[in-house]
């Protein structure tokens, strides 16, 4: 890494959490990612979701067909975990270098998660196989129970699912807790071994729930997990600038049409691929920690 008065030079970053969608939306948003990133973990929550090796191969081919020829970009594919996922299919995809990881969505926790996991015992066999072969599990860490307050769902999930079940039953499973938004998430990762890590988005480093709600609802700042109190934003900033290798870049860039955001029931997700790297760099500069930026953006990660 080289830092001069007006310039920072780092190894080309990787994005460890990205939504590209499909069709015309994929074509429109892909150039923003390839302009900045070398590789990206591609989320599988399409309609229908990516649940098989064949699905992943076809989706990867569609992504690559939209590259403009000069981009050196590698999409890393994931498998959408359902109650009926076959451990053999997961293992085959991993060994054939089609699946990089498996994505766990609690059913109905976020966009296109209705096919997600409804009961944790339903996926015990898959997680056991993943632990055995060293395959990472990517987790949307929120409790989907409507009785749980939306601002408490991440902390509840950590206390009752990750701490209470997953890390207990599968102590060697490689887990990435994606897009953490809370001080509890930071402390959980710091308290665990090297097999537990987390991604942090650019937007959760710069907005809090006042930015979303105070003085009027701003739908383009609505995402899941939802922005929290400012103390949590500050905890995220301290975590990513600490040099701890368990925290790394994952934009969770999630494009939607304007009509899908500006409606009486707007979709969750913030599109940030066009300026994510600059936002991250600004945060590191504000924290007087530019020397740690390359580790977070380009070197840490699964």
Predicted regions and their residues:
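Glycine-rich loop at the start of a catalytic domain that most often binds anionic cofactors/ligands
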Residues: 53-61
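Short, acidic/polar
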Residues: 23-30, 84-96
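Divalent metal-dependent hydrolysis catalytic cores, especially in the metallo-beta-lactamase
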Residues: 15-16, 29-54, 70-82, 99-112, ...
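Histidine-centered catalytic micro-motifs
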Residues: 12-23, 137-143, 200, 251-253
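His/Asp/Glu-enriched, well-ordered alpha-helical/loop segment
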Residues: 168, 241-302
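Histidine/acidic residue-rich metal-binding segments in metalloenzymes
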Residues: 3-5, 88-104, 112-249
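Conserved active-site and cofactor/substrate-binding residues in soluble primary-metabolism enzymes
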Residues: 24, 28, 51-54, 121, ...
